[in-house]
Amino acid sequence: AAFGAAALKLPTDATLIVQPLWGSIGFTLPAAYGAQIAAADRRVVLIVGDGAAQLTIQELGSMLRDKQRPLILLLNNEGYTVERAIHGPEQRYNDIALWDWNRLPDAFAPDVPSRCWRVTRTHELREAMNSSVASDRLTLVEVMLPKMDIPDFLRTVTQALEERNSRV
């Protein structure tokens, strides 16, 4: 998700927090939890891939327990697409268990209201986003994507890696 987020045009008062240097997938969910604690008066928007989210999903329970209201855009491409782009799209180790993401908030905190969406089309995403802007509860929007739907920036990086590695 960091490769796509790097290309976003954000409002001047927005802050983008990413940690791409060490390739530490799973960082953003707990980072969003901490960011919401640090800036309780602001709305955190988390963009996270499904593979990364599976590594630290327990922090969703902390967010709900503390009644945080982030907007979570979970990009579901059924695995580690960055790794697929680098190591090949058919490598089995880049596949993950398929979860029912919209049931997780209730599993972690059944008494805390939340809102969940699963979207497959642009107009559904717009509807979910418009409904979520003023929401007073945690909102999870599962965005269904093709396995190899990658941003141009990532495509450029992986092509450069392939060229470099082919000369070795």
Language model segments and positions:
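Thiamine diphosphate
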Residues: 3-168
